[in-house]
């Protein structure tokens, strides 16, 4: 599948972090979930609870070179799934999905015009806002099991040790390192994502060629963000406490820590509140409209 992370900063002049959360999940998603051909749609908002305070000394033990002010760079990131790049590039095409007196019709009210008020608007543009839409190469290590209780989702951001070639790095992360993480007690799902080296892969076709993201300023903005990390793991537990217990297993922690020192130039965690807007469906698409 074609998977995109879209990191977004709120409009700080209008909204607090919690107001942004309400505006994104409460209203914006009502429109964006109708993107043509969407196969999955999750919105991750960084949690108000400090993960460092919850984990205590363990946090410092399992993190290294966390970028200062990382959470100041974004408030949330949707992750969307499409069958392929072509489907993603055509996602903003309107479809007839509103019942009217004349039958099914294209909804004239379907628009995403709240963007400049919700997100970090770029002055001097016609409502454009700063974003990092990035294609992610997904590797499902352990399928996510979502119960009725809201799961705890931890994002593990990492940056490659520059002494290790990219191919060897990915093989090592997906090999012994992923195997050990998958053995963490209480783990309910684990996915490893590597950021596409082509930083504009998810932008081409979806955004106009004249979009700010293709300008020198837009490219520099994206490059600075991408320099911080090369990939991210998604780990699911019942609670942060369960993760702490699992990660302090003496045998696992010893080898995981050794591998992290070898593989990663930087590694750190962010707890996010995951909102499931469209449940990811990797099976062949049915021949009818569904969400």
Regions found by a protein language model. Name each.
Residues 1-291:
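Macromolecular interaction modules
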